[in-house]
Amino acid sequence: MRFLDIRDTNFDAEFAAILARGEETGREVEQVVLDIIADVRARGDEALLEYTRRFDRLEADSVAALQVTEDEIEYAFAKVKDEEIAALKLAVERVARFHEKQKQETWLSTTEPDILLGQMVTPLERVGIYVPGGKASYPSSVIMNAVPARVAGVGEIVMVAPTPGGEINPHVLVAARLSGVDRIFRMGGAQAVAALAYGTATVPRVDKITGPGNIYVATAKKLVFGQVGIDMIAGPSEILVINDGSGTPAHIAADLLSQAEHDELASSILITTDRGFGEQVATEVERQLAQLSRETIARTSWETYGAVIVAGSLDEAIAFSNRIAPEHLELAVANPFEILPRIKNAGAIFLGHFTPEAAGDYLAGPNHTLPTGGTARFFSPLSVDDFVKKSSIVYFSAAGLNRLGRDIVSIAEMEGLEAHGRSVSIRLK
């Protein structure tokens, strides 16, 4: 863990190591992923089975045998506690309610005589959602990807999840059923992304792939983009907490560790105007680390990519936050609503001392699939918009074309596109 002062002349150099996390590994895996994609594209189910045996240690006679059955889903419901099912149902309901507000309708404008202009909103026909299965089980990822797709009106939702040993976590299966997933395959990695992108004899080709995964999954999504749509290239998770010396150090420490336990590349940063408060938080992190079941992962993350930064003012802290555009931003200050309008770049913003980032991870309502690695400067959280496409609608009557046609021809002539102009002038009276 680094204890830094933003006013030090060498601050940028010291902080650069945190910003660069994972860059070198991304370059190393690209050729491996390219080969896997090409193989699945060429050999389909056969290649998919081979990679599933090799990477997931899962034996199957056919890809069809990798599809989860109705009996398996019913068995999952029997294994999950009633209170856990109730919590997942509540999460689905709240996430659906939030995303309903994002829906856009087809519209037509008739403000001009003889001309209709508008936009048609159409759900995607089929999407694939990737649910990670590595160092933890993530039913919340199912909900956050499948529910907005269902709210958008997507025709079919196909889910893939890596399952070393062959059994998908029952909480994940329950979440999939509650969220409206149609088909589930026990497969993961770059090979699953390739199968969704190009289709095989058994796995249907989708229009878009969403959901987080490891570096191989992220690279595969990047490489199949264009063949299919993708949501974003998600990197390691991150949290930035802005603090003014108010609040409880133990709370801030717990929030920092909630990200550190994700994986070793996760980054947890506190920037505070109160050095003493920062020191208390650092001490509290060490105390809480020893109590975590995932201590090894969290400690590696905290010691390598964690930081406590002292700022001279909230102005400095806000400017720093806008510069790095964090995935999760907590405003753990006395008056969070006062500084909220000054936040320009963040995936999700959590206000006040009683809004831990974990509330947004699970059932507050907004999506937890967020831009990472500074991409919140230009990317947004996953939403209903990711599962629809929009078509422009244009209608001119003869009178409408006669009214605007000469100007259309004039612009076509400016560009030297004679046939464009003629396609209009030939219709003019």
From Swiss-Prot:
Quote the protein name from its UniProt record: Histidinol dehydrogenase
**Names of required cofactors:** Zn(2+)
Report whether Disulfide bond shows up as a keyword of the record. Answer: no
Q: Which Gene3D superfamilies match?
A: 1.20.5.1300, Nitrogenase molybdenum iron protein domain
Q: Provide the function of this protein.
A: Catalyzes the sequential NAD-dependent oxidations of L-histidinol to L-histidinaldehyde and then to L-histidine.
The coding gene here is: hisD
EC number of the protein: 1.1.1.23
What's the domain of life for this entry?
Bacteria
What positions does the entry give for substrate binding? S237, Q259, H262, H328, D361, E415, H420
